[in-house]
Amino acid sequence: MARPLKTIALEPIKQPERFTKEDFLSQEDITQALDLALKQVRLNMDYFKEDFPTPATKDNQYAIMDNTEWTNAFWTGCLWLAYEYSGDDAIKALAQANDLSFLDRVTRDIELDHHDLGFLYTPSCMAEWKLLKTPESREAALKAADKLVQRYQDKGGFIQAWGELGKKEDYRLIIDCLLNIQLLFFASQETGDNRYRDMAINHFYASANHVIRDDASAYHTFYFDPETGDPVKGVTRQGYSDDSAWARGQAWGIYGIPLTYRFLKEPELIQLFKGMTHYFLNRLPKDQVSYWDLIFGDGSEQSRDSSATAIAVCGIHEMLKTLPDHDPDKKTYEAAMHSMLRALIKDYANKDLKPGAPLLLHGVYSWHSGKGVDEGNIWGDYYYLEALLRFYKDWNPYW
């Protein structure tokens, strides 16, 4: 049964012809980009061995860390994507070794008191289960889902992002979690237990009705009253200001909505996707790669966030599977994702291959804290590689 979903603004796409100045990417374009990325992945395999990269680079060089960050599985996801493209058993073996580390992490409950269980267990263990059906990978993903539902708050109907459960100062969701709830849909499908699905759906509607603004932009986070569950206010933690639109947050919405649509099939979700996507496309600079916050445009001298553009490409590609050919925006969406990915390949993909280097340059991790500004980041690497594989073949999402 459909739930109430607020109506948001739908801006017309401005100057859609800007996305058709160049031809669509050819299979040769994609293959060349994948071959280059694969070379960097192989260099990084020797560099990281069975450890993991830090979330972002410093001077375009990852440091090496253990499996304790929220970002670690994006490297493992790069390995699974590279394995799908190459068929190289050495890549598969390292990815499986990584996944055993994730099984150990969830079994021992190491640094998992947050909402990012989907980011940790989808591109790693869920990917392995979908590709190889190894029982250990399924076990790890289901344990992670059980850990994630512990953060569900009945009052407000959402998964609390961070902090002490139920504490007023921490009683909020964040837009990123639209990707994390895909782990709960997976758990429901695998176990037949609708409890996971129900929590995911409740969280989705809490997000759609509150963290997404009426003008189709998004807050980063949204607070609820822990006593009543009533909505309180939207604030940022990563964006420029509480009133601006953090580019990566907007992209999480663009991707999270079509992923959730697969399970809900509610037409209102398409309109939600369109609103958020049009808002994003209308604020791209001339080279089609977003600044780190959509409040900035050409001439602002701010940093881009290439990872946000890579995520948006994946989201548009996912929704295009659903949109009928007669949809008035479908051709523009297709042209836009080709234009954005072409820009990433041409001007943002790392071509200076060396151990520990990123696949994708010019991202932003956290502007306010000065972390990873105009650097590579591992989720940018992952979503760039995912976008390439989506264009290369009929790819079955890990999400």
From Swiss-Prot:
Binding site for substrate: 116, 176, 234, 236, 248, 252, 366, 369
Origin: domain of life: Bacteria
Keywords carried by this UniProt record: Glycosidase, Hydrolase
Temperature dependence comment: Optimum temperature is 37 degrees Celsius.
Signal peptide residues on this chain, from the entry's feature table: none
Record's catalysed reaction(s): beta-D-4-deoxy-Delta(4)-GlcpA-(1->3)-beta-D-GalpNAc6S + H2O = N-acetyl-beta-D-galactosamine 6-sulfate + 5-dehydro-4-deoxy-D-glucuronate
SUPFAM superfamilies xref list: Six-hairpin glycosidases (SSF48208)
Keyword 4Fe-4S belongs to the record: no
Molecular function GO labels: chondroitin hydrolase activity; unsaturated chondroitin disaccharide hydrolase activity
Active-site residues (renumbered): 116 (nucleophile), 176 (proton donor)
GO biological process entries: polysaccharide catabolic process
EC number, as in UniProt: 3.2.1.180
pH dependence, record text: Optimum pH is 5.5.
Cited function: Catalyzes the hydrolysis of unsaturated hyaluronate and chondroitin disaccharides. Also degrades unsaturated heparin disaccharides. Releases 4-deoxy-4,5-didehydro D-glucuronic acid or 4-deoxy-4,5-didehydro L-iduronic acid from chondroitin disaccharides, hyaluronan disaccharides and heparin disaccharides and cleaves both glycosidic (1->3) and (1->4) bonds. Prefers sulfated glycosaminoglycans compared to unsulfated glycosaminoglycans. Probably required for mammalian cells invasion through the degradation of extracellular sulfated glycosaminoglycans such as chondroitin and hyaluronan.
Subunit description: Monomer.
Family (UniProt): Belongs to the glycosyl hydrolase 88 family.
Name of the protein described by the UniProt record: Unsaturated chondroitin disaccharide hydrolase
